[in-house]
């Protein structure tokens, strides 16, 4: 199906099949469509609302065209990632949580990008921490295999996305592409915590990942609007495990955490996020640092469970709490900085 035929269909609020969506996405991602056509397609899909078949088709093409990271093994390799767009400007919880996971013995293939609507994306934070981002897929694989953690800078692995960059920027609205990033990890992880900007997306994205072969995934959205587990409100979870999807709410108290306001956790820039994370993963001298530490524990605990490194959410949170207090997570961040610095010298020689 070509994009003109697809536009005729979606204007009539008719869904595309998975294969039809693959056809259109390949045309978009290989530069065969005009910016006007891409913009019209994205807006039409938004107004119609994307079906599960359409998302599966789009994700499969993005994965097919990605510059992939090859790992020695994918057993238990996990990613913790969010769509962004929640408007809260909270510090980089999922990125900080990744280092707790690695310190706990998990293997983490973290996928992320620069901020679009927020104040600090995962790439912005890591750059502020002195971590070199412009790695080849092979170099990222060496980080993950050697240290148990590596960062895949989305723009380096999804170069075909450049064809949609202009229309997305000009539209200035959330589109299909906002939900594709967390679903297109270049290492092909089968274990994830995926935070989304709307509760309505939780079940559909869990079904998408089920169809694409994921093993254990938590798709989450908190009642106070975050694309992650919240200390201040219940969090809705669509969990894919053993090829079955269950849906439930989780209160902080269910996991041994105290409900509390998120006041003091919003940041204005990557440096502020880094300082809060340094405090949270280090000595926690401030009230906000302690609160940030608990937010990290909550989300890292969920990812330990998704990685099958813990038997339950509660067990994951307990393990994350113990690991965070050792200081090993901050050491792991510094290790990654030193490891990538060697690649920077190689790449810039």
Curated annotation (Swiss-Prot):
Q: How is the cofactor bound?
A: Binds 2 magnesium ions per monomer.
Q: Where does anthranilate 1 bind?
A: 82, 113
Annotated Mg(2+) 2 binding lies at 227-228
Q: Does the keyword Iron-sulfur apply?
A: no
EC numbers on record: 2.4.2.18
Q: Which cofactor does it need?
A: Mg(2+)
State whether keyword Magnesium applies: yes
Q: Write out the pathway annotation from the protein's UniProt entry.
A: Amino-acid biosynthesis; L-tryptophan biosynthesis; L-tryptophan from chorismate: step 2/5
Q: Which Pfam families match?
A: Glycos_trans_3N (PF02885), Glycos_transf_3 (PF00591)
Annotated residues that bind Mg(2+) 1 are located at 94, 228
The enzyme class is transferase
Task: State where anthranilate 2 binds.
Answer: 168
What reaction does this catalyse?
Answer: N-(5-phospho-beta-D-ribosyl)anthranilate + diphosphate = 5-phospho-alpha-D-ribose 1-diphosphate + anthranilate
Q: Which GO terms describe its biological process?
A: L-tryptophan biosynthetic process
Q: What keywords are assigned to this protein?
A: Amino-acid biosynthesis, Aromatic amino acid biosynthesis, Glycosyltransferase, Magnesium, Metal-binding, Transferase, Tryptophan biosynthesis
Any one GO CC term of this protein is: cytosol
Looking at the record's lineage, which domain of life comes first? Bacteria
Q: Report a single Gene Ontology molecular function.
A: magnesium ion binding
Q: How does it assemble?
A: Homodimer.
Give the protein's recorded name: Anthranilate phosphoribosyltransferase
Gene encoding it?
A: trpD
């Amino acid at each position: 199906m070509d994009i003109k035929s697809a536009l005729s269909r979606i204007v009539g609020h008719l869904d595309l099949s998975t294969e039809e969506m693959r056809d259109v996405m390949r045309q978009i991602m290989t530069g065969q469509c005009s910016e006007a056509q891409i913009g019209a397609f994205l807006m039409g899909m938004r107004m119609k609302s994307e079906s599960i078949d359409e998302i599966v088709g789009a994700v499969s093409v993005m994965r097919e065209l990605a510059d992939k990271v090859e790992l020695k093994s994918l057993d238990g390799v996990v990613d913790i990632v969010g769509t962004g767009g929640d408007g809260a400007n909270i510090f980089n919880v999922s990125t900080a949580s990744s280092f707790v996971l690695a310190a706990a013995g998990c293997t983490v293939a973290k996928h992320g990008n620069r901020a679009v609507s927020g104040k600090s994306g995962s790439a912005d934070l890591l750059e502020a921490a002195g971590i070199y981002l412009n790695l080849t897929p092979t170099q990222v694989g060496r980080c993950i295999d050697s240290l148990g953690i590596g960062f895949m800078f989305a723009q380096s692995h999804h170069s075909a996305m450049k064809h949609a960059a202009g229309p997305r920027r000009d539209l200035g609205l959330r589109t299909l592409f906002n939900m594709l990033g967390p679903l297109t990890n270049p290492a092909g992880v089968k274990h994830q915590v995926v935070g989304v900007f709307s509760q309505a997306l939780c079940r559909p994205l869990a079904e998408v990942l089920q169809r694409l072969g994921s093993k254990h995934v938590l798709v989450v959205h908190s009642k106070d609007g975050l694309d992650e587990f919240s200390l201040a409100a219940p969090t809705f979870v669509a969990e894919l495990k053993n090829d079955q999807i269950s849906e439930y709410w989780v209160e902080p108290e269910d996991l041994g955490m105290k409900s509390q306001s998120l006041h003091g956790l919003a940041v204005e820039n990557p440096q502020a996020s880094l300082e809060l994370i340094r405090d949270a993963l280090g000595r926690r001298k401030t009230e906000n640092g302690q609160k940030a530490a608990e937010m990290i524990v909550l989300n890292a605990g969920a990812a330990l469970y998704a990685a099958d490194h813990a038997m339950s959410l509660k067990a994951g949170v307990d393990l994350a709490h113990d690991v965070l207090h050792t200081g090993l997570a901050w050491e792991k961040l510094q290790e990654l900085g030193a490891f990538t610095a060697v690649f920077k010298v190689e790449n810039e020689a």
